[in-house]
Amino acid sequence: MAVSLNDIKNKIASTKNTSQITNAMQMVSAAKLGKSEEAAKNFQVYAQKVRKLVTDMLHGHEAENARHHSMLISRPVKKSAYIVITSDRGLVGGYNATILKALMELKAEYHPTGEDFEVICIGSVGADFFRARGIQPVYELRGLADQPSFDEVRKIISKTIEMYQNELFDELYVCYNHHVNSLTSQMRVEQMLPIIDLDPNEADEDYTLNLELESSRDSILDQLLPQFAESMIYGAIIDAKTAENAAGMTAMQTATDNAKKVISDLTIQYNRARQAAITQEITEIVAGASALE
C-alpha cells in the first residue's frame, strides 16, 4: 500500500508541475493576445484610409477606364490559388484543424483533380500538411512572429500578387481564422483578387470633385491597387495571428483547468488510500493484541 501511496503522490507532483507550465503559457498567450488585438485595431485605421482612397479614385465619369483595371476585372478561371494561414506550432486547440479541414472539403468540391488548385502557405503546420498529401505549396513562409510586421510578410505578399498579375492563377483567396473574441473565431475564405468588394458609390463626392492628379488616374491605380491588395492580405494575417494567440490562451487555460481536476481526483484517491492503509494497520494491531490475550 505504501508503494501505491508513493505512486499517487508522484502523479500529483507531476500534474502540479504540468499545471504550472500550462498556466505560465496561458499568461504568455494572454499578453500576446493583448498586443495582437491592439495591432489589429491600429491597422484597421490604415486599411480604411487606403480603401477610401481607392474608392474615391474609382468614382466618377473620369474613372470609367480605370474601373477596367486588370486587378478589378474577373477573367476566365483556369486556376485558383489559396493563401492558407496556420500556426507554426501546436498547442492551439482546433485552430489549425478547422482551416485545413474546410480547405480540403473545398478542394474536393471545386477542384477534385487538383490541377486547377494552388496553395500558398503561411505557417509550418499548413505547409507540412499539404506536403504530406502530395500538394506542393507554390510559396511558403515559416516562423512568423506573433505580431508580424509588414516587412516580415512583404515578400510573400508581393510575390503572390505578382503571380496573379502574371496570370499564373486567375483568382486568389485567403483562408484564415477571423478573431471574434478570446473564446471564438470564425473560419473565413475571402477573395482577394480580383478585387470585387469596392463600390465607387461609397466615394466622397466633394472630395472626388476637388481631386487634382499630377499623374494619370491609371498610373496612380497601377501603384495603389497592389498596395490595397497587400493591405487586405496583411490585414488577414494580423487577424489570423490574433485568433491564434486567443486559441493558444484558451487551450492552455483548458489544460490548466483539466490539470487542477486531475489533482483534485488524485488527492481524493490518495486520501482514501491513506485512510485504507491506516485502517489496515489498526486492524492488524488489534488482531495482534487479541492474539496475545
From Swiss-Prot:
<keyword id="KW-0406">Ion transport</keyword>
<dbReference type="GO" id="GO:0042777">
    <property type="term" value="P:proton motive force-driven plasma membrane ATP synthesis"/>
</dbReference>
<dbReference type="GO" id="GO:0005886">
    <property type="term" value="C:plasma membrane"/>
</dbReference>
<comment type="subunit">
    <text>F-type ATPases have 2 components, CF(1) - the catalytic core - and CF(0) - the membrane proton channel. CF(1) has five subunits: alpha(3), beta(3), gamma(1), delta(1), epsilon(1). CF(0) has three main subunits: a, b and c.</text>
</comment>
<dbReference type="InterPro" id="IPR000131">
    <property type="entry name" value="ATP_synth_F1_gsu"/>
</dbReference>
<comment type="function">
    <text>Produces ATP from ADP in the presence of a proton gradient across the membrane. The gamma chain is believed to be important in regulating ATPase activity and the flow of protons through the CF(0) complex.</text>
</comment>
<dbReference type="GO" id="GO:0046933">
    <property type="term" value="F:proton-transporting ATP synthase activity, rotational mechanism"/>
</dbReference>
<dbReference type="GO" id="GO:0045259">
    <property type="term" value="C:proton-transporting ATP synthase complex"/>
</dbReference>
<protein>
    <recommendedName>
        <fullName>ATP synthase gamma chain</fullName>
    </recommendedName>
</protein>
<keyword id="KW-0139">CF(1)</keyword>
<keyword id="KW-0375">Hydrogen ion transport</keyword>
<dbReference type="InterPro" id="IPR035968">
    <property type="entry name" value="ATP_synth_F1_ATPase_gsu"/>
</dbReference>
<dbReference type="Pfam" id="PF00231">
    <property type="entry name" value="ATP-synt"/>
</dbReference>
<keyword id="KW-0066">ATP synthesis</keyword>
<keyword id="KW-1003">Cell membrane</keyword>
<keyword id="KW-0472">Membrane</keyword>
<comment type="similarity">
    <text>Belongs to the ATPase gamma chain family.</text>
</comment>
<keyword id="KW-0813">Transport</keyword>
<dbReference type="InterPro" id="IPR023632">
    <property type="entry name" value="ATP_synth_F1_gsu_CS"/>
</dbReference>
<dbReference type="GO" id="GO:0005524">
    <property type="term" value="F:ATP binding"/>
</dbReference>
